[in-house]
Amino acid sequence: MTAATGLILYVHGARDPRWAEPFYRLRDKVAQRAAAAHVVVAFLEHGKPDLAEAAAAMAACDVVRIRIVPLFFGRGGHLREDFPRHLDDARRAAPLVEFELAEAAGENDAVLDALATYAVAAPDDSSSA
């Protein structure tokens, strides 16, 4: 990825801001691996920036191509029904930007393999018991 490339980690969002903390950690890890790209987390709802705001901010930094990575387990109603409207908003907010959509994270075999490995070896979380 080049400096003119943006990567948006697109997440659902939640009213409790602590919910987003793992996604910010993931953003930092992605930014380390794609050092030349602008990497942000954008929210479907209950968080800022939304997709259009993130796209506009990237366009203001001369980003010309944005890859949107939906961090959803599957292509449910939000990705099938809500996302197209949000993408239209992003295209209006950043009309000179080319957008590319990755598959939903949970539909990727490498992600499923990593989750299977985690599920088998997951440590106990006594803080939530």
Show where each model-derived region lies.
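Active-site-proximal alpha-helix that buttresses catalytic centers in soluble enzyme cores
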Residues: 1-129
